[in-house]
Regions:
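Short, T/G/N/S-enriched strand-turn elements that build extracellular solenoid repeat scaffolds
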Residues: 10-16, 31-37, 52-58, 73-80, ...
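Surface-exposed loop/turn motifs in large extracellular/passenger domains
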Residues: 1-6, 18-27, 38-48, 59-70, ...
Length: 204
């Protein structure tokens, strides 16, 4: 268990719990190009910013439980729970050009999600997201089971064919207070597809 104010684990730094759980409590965490890994549960409580650009937060056999003021997982950052679930409660979640994956996902990001060129996937179950605007331009959003999104706008468009975002799931249920922009984007469900939005642009 680690605690403190500002925690830095940059540039190939490694914090690893080989036999069990890892718990971190800090005012902020800078994990750029660093790794925080646990064999069991990996639990982080960060009061302010969690910067994981190019870094890795891992649970090998447990769950990944994250709370932070904001989370930047861009520039090749990885959030991974190989065999368990991942829960995230944060303000702005930036997953641009990052990878977030687990058997199931539950994300609450009060200030929005940025997933441009990113990959956000529930490999074995549901992917449930509650947020403000979700920007998936050029990104991938997936679930083996249900993909549920409650939010404001969903931006999935591209400038030309093949450049929009990709959404795929066993079932899709979107409830949006704002617009769904899907020009040159792709939304594909294996079974049910429910879209509720103030406006839908599906041209292209």
């Amino acid at each position: 268990r680690l605690g403190g104010g500002a925690l830095r684990n940059q540039q190939d730094g490694l914090i690893f719990s080989q036999a069990g759980a890892l718990e971190v409590q800090a005012g902020s965490l800078d994990n750029r190009q660093g790794t925080l890994q646990a064999q069991g549960d990996n639990r982080l409580r960060i009061g302010g910013a969690l910067d994981n650009q190019g870094g890795r937060l891992d649970s090998r056999a447990g769950n990944l439980d994250l709370q932070s003021g904001s989370l930047d997982n861009g520039a090749g950052g990885v959030l991974n729970s190989a065999k368990g679930w991942l829960t995230l409660v944060t303000g702005l979640f930036d997953n641009s050009a990052g990878v977030t994956q687990a058997q199931s996902l539950e994300i609450r990001a009060g200030q929005g999600v940025r997933n441009q060129q990113g990959h956000l996937s529930a490999l074995g179950g549901d992917n449930r997201i509650v947020t403000a605007d979700f920007d998936n331009q050029g990104g991938g959003l997936y679930a083996s089971g249900l993909l549920s999104l409650d939010g404001q706008r969903f931006l999935n468009q591209g400038a030309a064919a093949g450049q929009g975002g990709k959404v795929g799931a066993g079932r899709i249920d979107f409830s949006l207070a704002g617009a769904l922009a899907n020009r040159f984007g792709q939304l594909e469900s294996e079974s049910e597809l429910h879209l509720r939005a103030a406006a839908i642009d599906n041209s292209g």
